[in-house]
Amino acid sequence: RMYNTNDIHTVLTMIERDSNGLVKEKKTEVRPSYTSVEDDMIDLRVMPLRNYALTSYLQSRGVDIGIATTFCKEIHYTLRNKKYFAIAFPNKSGGFEVRNPYYKGCIKNKDVSVFYHTNGMTQEHICVFEGFMDFLSYMTLRKKGNTEICVDGMVDVLVMNSVANLRKSMDYLEPYKEIHCYLDNDIAGQKTVETFIGLFGGKVKDESARYREYKDLNDLLRGKKR
């Protein structure tokens, strides 16, 4: 037990506190910076994902475009008299995780994203991802028939969109027989999995060992070892 308590409220409060103060690993790759744009944003338009620059970016990350267009949208907006566009991944609160090669952020409310294999039905198994790029990477690997990484059979999916959304994830995870966690191989990912184990016990399966040589599923997809 990481937090020496069985009280769920106490555990959630502690993990949310810790997720805001985790030491970040050093990276040699330039990653998009996180920013919030909603307050100064105007002329917001959401449309099917077709922009060549965005689809090329996803292809550079190894993501199958057919999968990307199934789960993602394209968003355009004006910010401080300049026009921008990005990939938009919808969440349960009607908001979007937005990303392009230069930044990532959130428009409207921050929340988890959930996808059910069969509409109106819950499967016995669910796969949990930290961000939508990892989810798209997993679906790409699944399409390629990769059985070393992917779970067999029908599964539902929860994308946390941030480890700080652990509390919001709980209600969705409770009904499942097995919870397969495909989180990052870093401190934040490890703590989140350990917290899930503390809350849900043996139902939680830490799948990060399947890609232990990589930071996350997208790095695995691209063959980029740590």
Feature locations, PLM:
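Phosphate-handling DNA/RNA-contact segment within nucleic-acid enzymes
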Residues: 77-172
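TOPRIM fold recognition
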Residues: 2, 124, 140-226
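Terminal-region recognition feature
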Residues: 30-33, 53-60, 69, 207, ...
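Surface-exposed charge patches
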Residues: 56, 136, 198
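Electropositive nucleic-acid engagement tracts
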Residues: 37, 46, 50-80
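Helix N-cap/coil-helix junction residues
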Residues: 5, 63-64, 126
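Non-catalytic accessory segments of DNA primases and related replication-initiation nucleases
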Residues: 1-57
